[in-house]
């Protein structure tokens, strides 16, 4: 970008590349000419003192002018940034406006649809309300009609009762008159003796029945008042009245009359009768059929004329009794009585409405009628009463009776009653019309109210819509005003872009905040790249400023060409010192074409990892590292009162002790004895993991030792078994407890039986190799071979079979002691066909491994090729592994997400026995004979391979038997990132893979407990392997213990006594390997994202480290109590300087407890050793001190006890920092027994400069024997924090190392070995 003033890019004739502006160069030229004139006129001495001052002034002027140019460049960049931000803001604003318009249109359409649906709902609701109103009105009309019908029935019954009472009174009056008139007559005197007069017939006047009738006997015959010869003189009606049918005669419309009849009752063949209800309003005629045809012939018909209008009773009622031809003995008097009865019936209107003509039932109880209990008579039917009175009485009454006067009164009453009824009917009609009118008006009122409500709702909606339209109108006006303002602003195009006010302060603040967030995310990504590759920072190369500083001197040096040798070079100015995170813009020789190239240095370093690393960038990075370590060196060399000895920074307490105690303290310090790159030949090798070889074990269950083809037995084992028998026979519980405690202590000692051999897993881009070294002579690589193409993430040394191992076939539910029987007798086959598929959350997996039995007997030669040892399936799997894995820690973190992509994985949801045909046993692979010399000539390794097993030149039988029992002997287990598990022998034929299997996910950790190997997978499951019946490891049948869902990686495991602690996310699960169950789980950190990364156990405590955390946590091994927190970040910052150097953020990448010390390795290569304090120690060795507390812990699930040792507290006040460190993360610590320098060799107490330095001499009077341990740390690169990068390469401890360029040597994988002398306590 061309500026107004212009930047001159020019080259000096000497090629120095210095740049000077035109003004400064012009000034320099004029001063140069003036100086020439002065020298020509006077002498050089005149300007000799003036020259440095003028040069300094010109340099300052040039630097100021350069700064001015830089500021102008920055200003232009900021203007471009501002322009881009404004353009992006306008685009985003337009897009947002478009989206808001779309949203408004969609909202309007939705609102319209919603309104239509609401209108339909309201119309349906109004229709529903109208229908409900109509139904309600109809129901009201029905109820009113029912009430009216009930009222009419009540009025009818009342009139009927009144009419009956009037008739009764009238008949009584007639009887009294007749009896009074006929009381003196002779006829009555002669006939009075022949009958018994009754004042009144019994209620329900019942006819006497002939003897031949099958009907029931009435109540009147029970009284015995009527003799059989006088049966009321009513033999003319030979049938009872109940068998008489009243039929309508002389009716012009017989059909209509019959339709009006209501057949009220029937008489069955037995003579029973169902009666008419009392609520019947009409006076219906009852038709009573007869039982037999004979009775029908003898039946009398009474035909009653019934007019349509039942209220008119003034018509003639003719009753005609038809008699059939039969023998009757009836006199003329009786015929007269019959005609009188007919006349009375004719003048009695109630016979037209008689309901009780068929009132016989199976009993004498009346079924209907009004019964007057005071007179014990029937007050309803006059006909029944007269029928029972006899014809003589009626004849007596008829004589001299005047019926006309009373008949008129009755007719008048009936006529008046009829008129009243008509009036009432007319009123009822008017009333019903009015009620119907009221109903219609009510219905119309409800409909109008509904319409009014709908109109009100419509009015409210219209008002709301009106308000919305007004609001939209206001918004439209505001937008139009904004548009006018914007058009007015657009006219002011001469205003610069930075001064245009197009957005508010809030919007600008939001944009700036988003930019800052993006910057923070960019810096986080940059930090991640620094962690995974190396800590990067783009800093200016001081060489450019050196050249710029010397360019003016070059320009003016021509003045002193004759006296340049004698002129003293002035010191550089103070203001041009090196600035670490510089932000200067230095114009370079090459012309840069992009805007990014002119960004300041702190911006351009954010993008430097995207470009390829050139030699210049590597050089600048090394220069930056060198400057960083130079500042660390300056900080370390400050006098802070700490003691430096053997490469360690010790606390001040070592000064305060006496000479004897000081030597005793100094002798326990770790002394560095070896330091060198891991492999001189392969410089790209990266360290992953390492472990010391445990060569113990290889015993049968009764203590016998397995060597070659024969089995030898120890006498100690026999004594031990006899002692166990005696112990089991003993009844003393104290003896059992004592023996258990002794066994626990013996197992603790057995765990420390290691050899000095170390297996180190390294990887290149193509494959993973195993290097086997002896810690006593680390420079001599005993053997190296390739394992697989994937990264080996973990390695474990598994001892051989011991007599204390758990039996392989022991049931899971057993919790007793281990049976000391023979190996084969106590083990049962654990094949997939015989075990349960799921044991309480444990999945049993069975793999058919072809060639297992055949591989044990097939002889094979030594020195097998690593490629030949792998089956074809394994090679196919390993070839697909990603090779670009940054570092060990990040790669193991990445396995949680992407390790599940390996093929042929087993479905986790499938329960039951798995049958995996993935790998065959590599023992079955035949090895060519011509490869055997490779094995024999491999770095003099036979001396180490011959510790237990055989040499290549022994007999074939011995070799075969050794191969059979090789898995019974100590082995090495390697877990790869692709899920492959490899088992190699650790005693002989190291290259040969004895067993292998492909598991479901990446293998992150392997531990061994008493004949059980637990393998932690990245999917949150534990694979548990046991030995087979022959003592060899059976990888074809194993158990899977799921730690729960969701599945996450099991990052780390450690053995704590007889249990295994597993780090699973932020939790720690305690697993019992024998029972294969989870005993306890607790949180090691409150946040779920913080994963447990390392576990280290000693005594009764377990130290825990958390990912991306600098705090160590101590937990009790038995009670799981949180005991202590130790933060190492303040200590590291104090020892190595401020946080600008990248040392403030401390990640713990390696953790180990050894030699009564806690060894901590960090992500930036710092190694810290913290002595474990003895203040809280309960008992060192139980029972060796009188009066000391012996702590014993019991298991709540069994009667097992565990001896308490001590709790490994530590304090950062006693922490010791090692000046020997790595340039990148510390990958591992390994502690093995061994001694490089003798304890008698003494040194001057200064720091170590060669292999001959060592700890102070042991006192002759000290009686505690000292053990020597070698502690190995591995990591990328080496740095001495006291020396920085200047002499770090020259101080590598090793005598025969060839000198190589520091560019590659200082950044290779290095091993650092310390020797530690410590006592038994």
Curated annotation (Swiss-Prot):
<dbReference type="GO" id="GO:0005829">
    <property type="term" value="C:cytosol"/>
</dbReference>
<feature type="modified residue" description="Phosphoserine">
    <location>
        <position position="728"/>
    </location>
</feature>
<dbReference type="GO" id="GO:0051146">
    <property type="term" value="P:striated muscle cell differentiation"/>
</dbReference>
<feature type="modified residue" description="Phosphoserine">
    <location>
        <position position="238"/>
    </location>
</feature>
<feature type="compositionally biased region" description="Basic and acidic residues">
    <location>
        <begin position="473"/>
        <end position="489"/>
    </location>
</feature>
<feature type="modified residue" description="Phosphoserine">
    <location>
        <position position="194"/>
    </location>
</feature>
<dbReference type="GO" id="GO:0008432">
    <property type="term" value="F:JUN kinase binding"/>
</dbReference>
<dbReference type="GO" id="GO:0019894">
    <property type="term" value="F:kinesin binding"/>
</dbReference>
<dbReference type="GO" id="GO:1903860">
    <property type="term" value="P:negative regulation of dendrite extension"/>
</dbReference>
<dbReference type="InterPro" id="IPR039911">
    <property type="entry name" value="JIP3/JIP4"/>
</dbReference>
<feature type="compositionally biased region" description="Polar residues">
    <location>
        <begin position="236"/>
        <end position="253"/>
    </location>
</feature>
<feature type="modified residue" description="Phosphoserine">
    <location>
        <position position="251"/>
    </location>
</feature>
<feature type="domain" description="RH1">
    <location>
        <begin position="7"/>
        <end position="95"/>
    </location>
</feature>
<feature type="modified residue" description="Phosphoserine">
    <location>
        <position position="730"/>
    </location>
</feature>
<feature type="modified residue" description="N-acetylmethionine">
    <location>
        <position position="1"/>
    </location>
</feature>
<keyword id="KW-0458">Lysosome</keyword>
<feature type="modified residue" description="Phosphothreonine">
    <location>
        <position position="1264"/>
    </location>
</feature>
<feature type="modified residue" description="Phosphoserine">
    <location>
        <position position="265"/>
    </location>
</feature>
<dbReference type="Pfam" id="PF19056">
    <property type="entry name" value="WD40_2"/>
</dbReference>
<feature type="modified residue" description="Phosphothreonine">
    <location>
        <position position="595"/>
    </location>
</feature>
<comment type="subunit">
    <text>Homodimer. The homodimer interacts with ARF6, forming a heterotetramer. Homooligomer. Interacts with MAX, MAPK14, MAP3K3, MYC, KNS2 and MAP2K4. Interaction with KNS2 is important in the formation of ternary complex with MAPK8. Interacts with NFKB1. Interacts with PIP4P1. Interacts with PIKFYVE.</text>
</comment>
<feature type="modified residue" description="Phosphoserine">
    <location>
        <position position="1188"/>
    </location>
</feature>
<dbReference type="GO" id="GO:0034451">
    <property type="term" value="C:centriolar satellite"/>
</dbReference>
<protein>
    <recommendedName>
        <fullName>C-Jun-amino-terminal kinase-interacting protein 4</fullName>
    </recommendedName>
</protein>
<feature type="modified residue" description="Phosphothreonine">
    <location>
        <position position="418"/>
    </location>
</feature>
<dbReference type="GO" id="GO:0045666">
    <property type="term" value="P:positive regulation of neuron differentiation"/>
</dbReference>
<feature type="compositionally biased region" description="Low complexity">
    <location>
        <begin position="894"/>
        <end position="903"/>
    </location>
</feature>
<dbReference type="GO" id="GO:0045665">
    <property type="term" value="P:negative regulation of neuron differentiation"/>
</dbReference>
<feature type="modified residue" description="Phosphoserine">
    <location>
        <position position="732"/>
    </location>
</feature>
<feature type="modified residue" description="Phosphoserine">
    <location>
        <position position="332"/>
    </location>
</feature>
<dbReference type="InterPro" id="IPR015943">
    <property type="entry name" value="WD40/YVTN_repeat-like_dom_sf"/>
</dbReference>
<feature type="modified residue" description="Phosphoserine">
    <location>
        <position position="203"/>
    </location>
</feature>
<dbReference type="GO" id="GO:0048471">
    <property type="term" value="C:perinuclear region of cytoplasm"/>
</dbReference>
<feature type="modified residue" description="Phosphoserine">
    <location>
        <position position="347"/>
    </location>
</feature>
<feature type="modified residue" description="Phosphoserine">
    <location>
        <position position="733"/>
    </location>
</feature>
<feature type="modified residue" description="Phosphoserine">
    <location>
        <position position="588"/>
    </location>
</feature>
<dbReference type="GO" id="GO:0032418">
    <property type="term" value="P:lysosome localization"/>
</dbReference>
<keyword id="KW-0968">Cytoplasmic vesicle</keyword>
<keyword id="KW-0472">Membrane</keyword>
<keyword id="KW-0597">Phosphoprotein</keyword>
<feature type="modified residue" description="Phosphoserine">
    <location>
        <position position="109"/>
    </location>
</feature>
<feature type="modified residue" description="Phosphoserine">
    <location>
        <position position="183"/>
    </location>
</feature>
